[in-house]
C-alpha cells in the first residue's frame, strides 16, 4: 500500500500528486441470491441471502451498455515511475466518478492520515464546481479537463466571451493571448492576439483605441472551474495533465493483467 511504497522510497506522501479514475468491474449478469424459505411462490417477499449485497447496475459509457458489479475507483501516484497505486476502492456500479472521487479520497485520508495531497489530476467526468472549491479550500492544485456539456462557450463580458478551452475570445472570435498572472490580485492578463503580433493572425477589427490593444483581466475567483491556475492553454497544465493516464494504466493492470473480473466475488 501507500505506506510500504513510502518506506521503499518510491512515493512521497508529504507531496503527493494523485491521479484518479474509475472503471467498471463486471461480477455477474444479475444480482445473485438464494432463498431462505420454502415458499413455492417464485416471487415471494421472504428474506434472501445475497452473495454481493453491495453491487448494483451501472452504465459503461465507453461501451454504451449496462453492467452489473462494481465501480473500481483507483488513486495512483502520478509522479511515480511505475504508476503505483495509492488507494483503490470498490464502489457501487451506479456511482458516478465525481462521487467516487469523494468517497475514495476521504477513505484514503482515513487510512493514510500522513498523506498530504498537493495536486490532483482528473478527467472531464470530474468537472464539477464543488470539486474545484474543495481543492481550493485544501490548497490542492486541480488539473481537470473541461466537460463541454457543463457549459463553457458563453458570453462573459461585453468585450469578450469564453471559448471551449476556458480562454477569453475577443469580439472578432480570436483566442486572446495569455500575458502573465498577477498573484496578489489572483487574476490572469490576456491581450489582443493581433497587437501581440502572433504568427498567422491578422484582424482588421479594432477592439480598443489603445496601441497596446485590448487587455482583459480575468480573476480566477470568479469561476474556479473555467479560470484555473495554471491556465489550460499553458505548457505546464498540459504536461501535468498527461500524467493523469497513470490511473488508467493501473486500472488496466488490475482488470487485465491480474484478471480482477475472473475471480469469485463475494462481499
Where would I find each of the regions flagged by the language model?
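A generic structural signal for short, non-catalytic loop/turn and secondary-structure boundary residues
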Residues: 11-13, 67, 185, 209-211, ...
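An internal, acidic/charged active-site-proximal segment
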Residues: 98-194, 231
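Short amphipathic alpha-helical "interface-anchor" segments enriched in bulky aromatics
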Residues: 156-185, 220-266
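Long, low-complexity, polar/charged, intrinsically disordered or flexibly structured peripheral segments
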Residues: 189-230
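Mature extracytoplasmic/luminal segments of secretory-pathway proteins
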Residues: 34-36, 41-43, 54, 157, ...
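Polybasic low-complexity intrinsically disordered regions
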Residues: 1-120, 124-137, 147
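Detector for glycine-centered tight turns/loop "hinges" at secondary-structure junctions
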Residues: 81-83, 166, 173, 200
Amino acid at each position: 500500500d501507500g505506506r510500504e511504497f513510502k518506506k521503499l522510497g518510491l512515493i512521497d506522501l508529504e507531496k503527493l500528486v494523485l491521479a484518479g479514475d474509475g472503471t467498471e468491474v463486471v461480477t455477474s449478469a444479475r444480482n445473485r441470491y438464494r432463498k431462505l424459505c420454502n415458499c413455492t411462490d417464485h416471487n415471494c417477499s421472504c428474506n434472501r441471502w445475497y452473495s454481493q449485497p453491495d453491487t448494483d447496475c451501472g452504465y459503461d459509457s465507453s461501451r454504451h451498455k449496462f453492467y452489473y458489479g462494481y465501480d473500481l475507483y483507483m488513486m495512483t501516484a502520478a509522479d511515480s515511475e511505475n504508476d503505483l497505486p495509492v488507494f483503490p476502492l470498490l464502489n457501487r456500479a451506479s456511482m458516478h466518478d465525481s462521487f467516487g472521487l469523494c468517497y475514495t479520497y476521504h477513505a484514503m485520508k482515513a487510512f493514510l492520515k500522513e498523506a498530504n495531497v498537493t495536486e490532483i489530476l482528473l478527467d472531464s467526468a470530474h468537472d464539477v464546481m464543488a470539486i474545484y472549491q474543495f481543492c481550493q479550500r485544501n490548497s490542492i492544485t486541480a488539473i481537470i479537463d473541461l466537460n463541454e456539456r457543463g457549459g463553457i462557450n458563453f458570453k462573459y463580458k461585453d468585450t469578450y466571451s469564453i471559448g471551449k478551452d476556458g480562454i477569453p475570445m475577443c469580439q472578432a472570435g480570436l483566442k486572446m493571448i495569455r500575458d502573465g498572472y498577477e498573484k496578489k490580485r489572483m487574476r490572469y492578463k490576456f491581450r489582443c492576439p493581433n497587437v501581440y503580433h502572433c504568427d498567422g493572425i491578422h484582424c482588421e477589427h479594432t477592439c480598443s483605441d489603445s496601441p497596446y490593444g485590448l487587455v482583459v483581466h480575468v480573476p480566477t475567483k470568479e469561476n474556479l472551474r473555467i479560470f484555473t491556475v495554471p491556465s489550460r492553454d499553458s505548457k505546464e497544465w498540459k504536461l501535468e495533465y498527461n500524467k493523469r493516464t497513470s490511473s488508467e494504466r493501473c486500472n488496466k493492470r488490475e482488470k487485465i493483467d491480474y484478471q480482477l473480473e475472473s475471480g469469485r466475488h463475494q462481499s
